[in-house]
């Protein structure tokens, strides 16, 4: 496979009304990697931005690296291709450069029975959000009876048929990734494991494990965000290092990941932030800087997905 661009634009939480313009700004700023997902419910608008810049002649499709993700209600093998085609249709693309299993957990599909007509599935997938999180009377997700090893076989078929160039996973712990890598008859290894990663959740052990197995790591939420009064951007250590390098705190947080050989996908719809976030290749953090940032680790996970904690494949019950 070709290398995944080191910095990409995450389209998570980018409202449909603003993400098209954000994609245009990003391409002009030098971004070539765009991280999408069915669950973000904005793929149509992301695709509009991509097509605009291609038509304009600013970029070619083959210059771009477009990733999307399989949602949890479509883990049954017979639904994987339909879900992938849905994302391709929304993006108006012929292929994806990367397709990920969004979470290792399969949910009950949007129909009471596993067998679903194409028209029913088409309706569910064209009304995003309606059936994404099937809940029981306790407001916990209703699991499906799938196994991600079976889902992976359908993901591999997408590569064979040319719908996607590469496949990977997201939010897998090391035991789940090891189980996948040891799968009998494995045709394609996951090229990356996309995980939450920032200085308050450095993921040192999981990154080491993935890289030792030849699986790259992609960091989502690299700027941390705010949770329970904690805002990583305002951390005194990050602020000090930023001042020393005459860079923004966000640039320090992004550079921190690239120096760990971790792909990083910050998200923003603000043009100035989009441009700033990719300007991280003209300076280098010292080893002292890196050690100080690593020392901030507090195992603070922001994306805990609590309504799935009872699922057999919930990934965060173990240390890494």
Swiss-Prot record:
GO molecular function list: 1,5-anhydro-D-fructose reductase activity
Example of a GO cellular component annotation carried by this entry: cytoplasm
Major localization listed first in the record, in broad terms: cytoplasm
Regulation: Inhibited by p-chloromercuribenzoic acid and alkyliodines.
Site (Lowers pKa of active site Tyr): 69
Any matching Pfam family: Aldo_ket_red
Assembly and interaction partners: Monomer.
UniProt family annotation: Belongs to the aldo/keto reductase family.
Protein name: 1,5-anhydro-D-fructose reductase
Organism expressing this protein natively: Macaca fascicularis (Crab-eating macaque)
Gene expressing this chain: AKR1E2
């Amino acid at each position: 496979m070709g290398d995944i661009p080191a910095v990409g634009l995450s389209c998570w939480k980018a409202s449909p009304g603003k993400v098209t313009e954000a994609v245009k700004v990003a391409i002009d700023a030098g971004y070539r990697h765009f991280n999408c997902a069915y669950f973000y419910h904005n793929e149509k608008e992301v695709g509009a931005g991509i097509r605009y810049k291609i038509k304009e002649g600013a970029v070619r499709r083959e210059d771009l690296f477009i990733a999307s993700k399989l949602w949890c209600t479509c883990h049954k093998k017979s639904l994987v291709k339909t879900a992938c085609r849905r994302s391709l249709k929304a993006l108006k693309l012929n292929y994806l450069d990367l397709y990920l299993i969004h979470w290792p957990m399969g949910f009950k599909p949007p129909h009471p029975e596993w067998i679903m007509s194409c028209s029913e599935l088409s309706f569910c997938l064209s009304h995003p959000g309606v059936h994404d999180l099937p809940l029981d009377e306790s407001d916990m997700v209703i699991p499906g009876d799938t196994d991600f090893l079976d889902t992976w076989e359908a993901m591999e078929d997408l590569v064979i048929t040319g719908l996607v160039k590469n496949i990977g996973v997201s939010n897998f712990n090391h035991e789940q990734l090891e189980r996948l890598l040891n799968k009998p008859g494995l045709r394609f290894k996951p090229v990356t494991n996309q995980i939450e990663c920032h200085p308050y959740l450095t993921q040192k052990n999981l990154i080491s494990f993935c890289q030792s197995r030849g699986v790259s790591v992609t960091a989502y939420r690299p700027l941390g965000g705010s949770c329970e009064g904690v805002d990583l951007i305002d951390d005194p250590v990050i602020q000090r290092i930023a001042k020393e390098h005459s860079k923004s705190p966000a640039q320090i947080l992004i550079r921190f990941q690239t120096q760990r050989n971790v792909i990083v996908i910050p998200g923003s719809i603000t043009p100035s932030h989009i441009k700033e976030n990719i300007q991280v290749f003209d300076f280098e953090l010292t080893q002292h800087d890196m050690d100080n940032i690593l020392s901030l680790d507090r195992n603070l996970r922001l994306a805990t997905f609590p309504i799935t904690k009872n699922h057999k494949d919930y990934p965060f019950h173990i240390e890494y």
